[in-house]
Amino acid sequence: MQTGSGVYHAEELPAGTEMFQIWFEPHLARAVKEAPTYHQYDHEQFPVEEADGVRIKHVIGPQAPIRLVTDAEMADIEIAAGQSWTYSLPDGYALAAVVVSGRGTAWPQRQADGGAADNAPLETGDFTVVTTNGTESVVFQAEPGESLRLVAIRVPAEVEYPLYRK
């Protein structure tokens, strides 16, 4: 849903559906001039990659059917027990992740000096944000014997337009 100058709302959720809402702040002066839009997507419409015990469903971004007026990418990631997923975070961006289910760890791998920070434990319901001072990779590792599912969102750490007043 992109609200623009108003809102269209029409969810119909079948039994067993899980969802959460995320609001991205566009350039408000431009966004209010746009007509509101609403689209319903089915699971099969999202491209999925699978390799080395990691399944990535692209939700928002260049590989996904959902494109926004804001600079954002979003993926639903499932990491098999004991496996890891590494994401290269460009300079000037932040990666936010919410753990949907499971347990594991996350840590940044700094590419500039080759060092690594301590592992941060993660479990269902946890939310973490990683920002960079240069290109860096973030590693998410599932616990042995338990898979880890998270939703990861990449956005600019700062934008060059005014945000909503808090």
Enumerate the language-model features and the residues they cover.
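Jelly-roll (double-stranded beta-helix
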Residues: M1-K166
